[in-house]
A protein has these predicted regions:
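Membrane-embedded segments
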Residues: 46-144
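Conserved beta-sheet core of the metallophosphoesterase superfamily
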Residues: 193-244
Length: 244
């Protein structure tokens, strides 16, 4: 009977279709689940090291497009369970055409976030215009915008935000010039950065709104890409801990 089933073209095609649908559904379900990664950053050759600091990094949520405001509210609860010292939004929190109601709901959820050293954000390529337009409202939710700016936390950790886009975007070289090389630093980068520049500025960690890796020939390539949209990255959170 098994032989007859697989020997029948129509049934074989149907079986392949069912298996493909099941695999696709499993991948989609997994992509919507929030996953955590832990990274340890060693503060080498720093005259002013910081104490252990827990950081939650969130990017590519595309609220109003890939993620609903309700789903984001659930994400906030999971973040608060981690009890982070700092929360970083690395870009593309909103979609390109997120409406006002969804923006307000999202910001109301952000107000419930708890981070002793604050919440910081840089916009991504998708929401650069929206963030620039709504920056006062976003700041009112307790978010510190790093639009080609730097900030030094109370524990000495530097945060630098390099914008992805926007009419008033400054060159990355200018923003990186704000870094104090004696302090550990995390750069939220909206565009790819050469490895030699990272070494020159003694940057501890560079975070991108999409995972970008060096191809070895001076270029970059995206990883964890899913067709037609990078759904996996939209629900991705990286948990990092700074250590001496």
């Amino acid at each position: 009977k098994i032989y007859r089933f697989f020997n029948h073209p129509t049934k074989l095609i149907l079986g392949f279709f069912v298996v493909t649908m099941c695999v696709g559904a499993a991948i989609f379900w997994k992509s919507r689940c929030i996953s955590w990664e832990e990274t340890v950053i060693l503060q080498e050759n720093k005259k002013e090291p910081v104490k252990d600091t827990s950081i939650v990094y969130i990017s590519n949520c595309f609220v109003g497009s890939d993620m609903t405001a309700h789903a984001f509210d659930s994400l906030v609860e999971k973040v608060n369970e981690k009890k982070p010292d700092v929360i970083l939004f690395g870009g593309n929190l909103f979609g390109r055409h997120t409406n006002e109601v969804t923006i307000d709901k999202t910001l109301a959820s952000i107000k419930k976030m708890k981070a002793a050293l604050g919440i910081y954000m840089v916009e991504g390529s998708a929401d650069s215009a929206l963030v620039e337009e709504k920056k006062e409202k976003i700041s009112g939710a307790g978010v510190h915008l790093l639009l080609d700016e730097s900030a030094v936390l109370h524990n000495g950790l530097q945060l630098v935000g390099c914008r992805a886009d926007g009419k008033t975007k400054k060159p990355m070289s200018y923003t990186l010039s704000l870094i104090n090389k004696e302090k550990p630093s995390i750069v939220l980068a909206g565009e790819a950065m050469e490895e030699k520049l990272k070494e020159e500025k003694k940057i501890s960690l560079v975070l991108y709104p999409k995972k970008i890796t060096d191809t070895g020939n001076g270029g970059t390539s995206g990883v964890n890409q899913m067709f037609p949209r990078n759904v996996l990255a939209s629900a991705k959170i990286n948990f990092m801990q700074i250590k001496k």
